[in-house]
């Protein structure tokens, strides 16, 4: 699965999302639950803003010295007997993983949840050479069983599905006959996955954070599946975006605390594992360890106005407060990275041809910026995207550009402005009934197709104000 989801146009995806009342109910319920948990967890910590500032400082420092820390990480992993591969593109990353699988004659592969492996289309690449790839994260496994449905959330992939829908998928695809309770369904999947773990020739994980000075990677899960992915198969491949770094364990401690509280509202998730190449005296762990460090456009973001987006720790706090995501769901974004973070990141990694609409899918309420634990100014970056799209890319709709040009001319000419402010209310009120415009024309049509527009006042404010002044004199 690549970054791009489906081939439908943006407006069509939005329309489908708005009409899917079941999905909207599931998303709304999950957002409210995660929001309350995050508030509670952050309040327990105390001085939350100070922790956010510290998280921002760590991420900014790491990005400012990223080349040094990447070199240190590579040296640390190699010194411990691991293998490091720097992939400039997603094709290079997938090809390397294919090469390792073929070299090790791996046919059965288990993996934990990883957005970057989705980004590089790793599953498809491995399936092309005859490998069976099984998702071990429960949410990802549900989607894989459901005809490879794409994820709609970066932390909870199946957030858009109800338990009734999940039970139906298991019944149709796996012959499941038990109840729709989470306990029964989880127990059913656990039994299947245990066999897959024991049969696996190779395990693949993502990487929440890599620790430069130790050559370790940190994996954060609620299910413990990543531990089994790294411990049972003889070969472990970890795939990370090049920015997912911390200098030392001290910084890791801070960011893991911020991640867990912001993602699921817990002090710590159930399983936090720090792994890497197996030591000579260690009993557990893989015989061979590979770390694939993926660029895929990230280096092009460094040193630009959009660099702060690389501070992201993939907690999804911004998604969990976004009113647009709440109403249209994750699939409407057409990217594996949905929500505010996706609206900023997707155009940078995937290009404006596919994602030019996303920066406009925002009310600019800045709730995302307030929620971000590392203080990424998401709403400001969305505005910057809009500026680039209109001024540098020249991609704004022609009708919109013409309208803004005409408005600029009118607003800068007092006579034309006076005439416009008198004429516009007269024209709009001709379309009104009982103070509401229900059938607009031109630029008003898209609005009135789905909601009424209050008719403007027949009297301009400046005229009313002048009358008021005269009455008071």
UniProtKB/Swiss-Prot annotation:
PANTHER family linked: LACTATE UTILIZATION PROTEIN B
4Fe-4S as UniProt keyword: yes
Lineage of the species this protein comes from: Bacteria, Bacillati, Bacillota, Bacilli, Bacillales
Pfam families linked: Fer4_8 (PF13183), LUD_dom (PF02589), LutB_C (PF11870)
An example Gene Ontology molecular-function term: 4 iron, 4 sulfur cluster binding
Protein name per the record: Lactate utilization protein B
Domain 4Fe-4S ferredoxin-type: 303-333, 352-381
Residues involved in [4Fe-4S] cluster 1 binding: 312, 315, 318, 372
Sites where the protein binds [4Fe-4S] cluster 2: 322, 365, 368
Gene: lutB
InterPro entries cross-referenced by the UniProt entry: 4Fe4S_Fe-S-bd, 4Fe4S_Fe_S_CS, FTHF_cligase-like_sf, Helical_ferredxn, LUD_dom, LutB, LutB/LldF, LutB_C
Function per UniProt: Is involved in L-lactate degradation and allows cells to grow with lactate as the sole carbon source. Has probably a role as an electron transporter during oxidation of L-lactate.
Keyword field: 4Fe-4S, Electron transport, Iron, Iron-sulfur, Metal-binding, Repeat, Transport
Family per similarity comment: Belongs to the LutB/YkgF family.
């Amino acid at each position: 699965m690549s970054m791009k989801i489906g081939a439908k146009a943006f407006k069509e995806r939005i329309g489908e999302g708005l009409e899917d009342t079941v999905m909207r109910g599931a998303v709304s319920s999950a957002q409210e639950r995660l929001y309350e948990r995050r508030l509670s967890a952050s309040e327990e910590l105390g001085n939350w803003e100070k922790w956010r500032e510290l998280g921002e400082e760590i991420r900014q420092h790491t990005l400012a010295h990223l080349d040094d820390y990447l070199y240190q990480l590579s040296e640390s992993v190699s010194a411990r007997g691991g293998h490091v591969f720097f992939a400039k593109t997603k094709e290079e990353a997938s090809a390397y993983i294919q090469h390792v699988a073929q070299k090790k004659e791996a046919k059965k592969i288990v993996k934990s949840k990883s957005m970057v492996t989705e980004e590089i289309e790793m599953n498809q690449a491995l399936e092309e050479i005859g490998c069976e790839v099984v998702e071990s994260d429960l949410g990802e496994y549900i989607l894989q069983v459901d005809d490879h449905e794409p994820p709609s959330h970066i932390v909870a992939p199946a957030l858009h599905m109800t338990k009734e829908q999940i039970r139906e998928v298991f019944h149709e695809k796996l012959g499941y006959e038990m109840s729709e309770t989470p306990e029964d369904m989880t127990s059913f999947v656990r039994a299947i996955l245990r066999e897959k773990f024991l049969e696996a020739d190779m395990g693949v994980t993502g990487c929440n954070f890599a620790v430069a000075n130790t050559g370790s990677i940190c994996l954060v899960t609620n299910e413990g599946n990543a531990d089994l992915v790294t411990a049972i198969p003889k070969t472990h491949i970890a795939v990370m975006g090049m920015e997912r770094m911390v200098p030392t364990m001290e910084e890791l401690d801070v960011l893991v605390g911020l991640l867990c509280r912001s993602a699921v509202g817990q002090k710590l998730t159930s399983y936090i594992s720090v792994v890497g190449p197996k030591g000579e005296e260690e009993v557990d762990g893989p015989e061979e360890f590979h770390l694939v460090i993926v660029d895929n456009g990230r280096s092009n973001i460094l040193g630009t106005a959009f660099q702060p987006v690389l501070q992201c720790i993939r907690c999804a706090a911004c998604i969990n407060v976004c009113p647009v995501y709440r109403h249209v769901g994750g699939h409407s974004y057409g990217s594996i990275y949905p929500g505010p973070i996706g609206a900023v990141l997707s155009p940078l990694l995937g290009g404006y041809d596919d994602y030019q609409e996303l920066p406009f899918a925002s009310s600019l309420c800045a709730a995302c910026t307030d929620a971000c634990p590392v203080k990424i100014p998401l709403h400001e970056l969305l505005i910057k995207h809009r500026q680039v799209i209109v001024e540098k890319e020249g991609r704004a709709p022609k009708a919109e550009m013409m309208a803004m040009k005409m408005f600029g001319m009118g607003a800068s000419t007092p006579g034309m402005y006076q005439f416009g402010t008198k004429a516009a209310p007269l024209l709009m009120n001709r379309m009104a009934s009982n103070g509401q415009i229900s059938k607009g024309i031109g630029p008003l049509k898209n609005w009135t197709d789905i909601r009424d527009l209050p008719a403007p006042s027949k009297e301009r404010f400046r005229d009313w104000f002048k009358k008021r002044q005269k009455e008071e004199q």
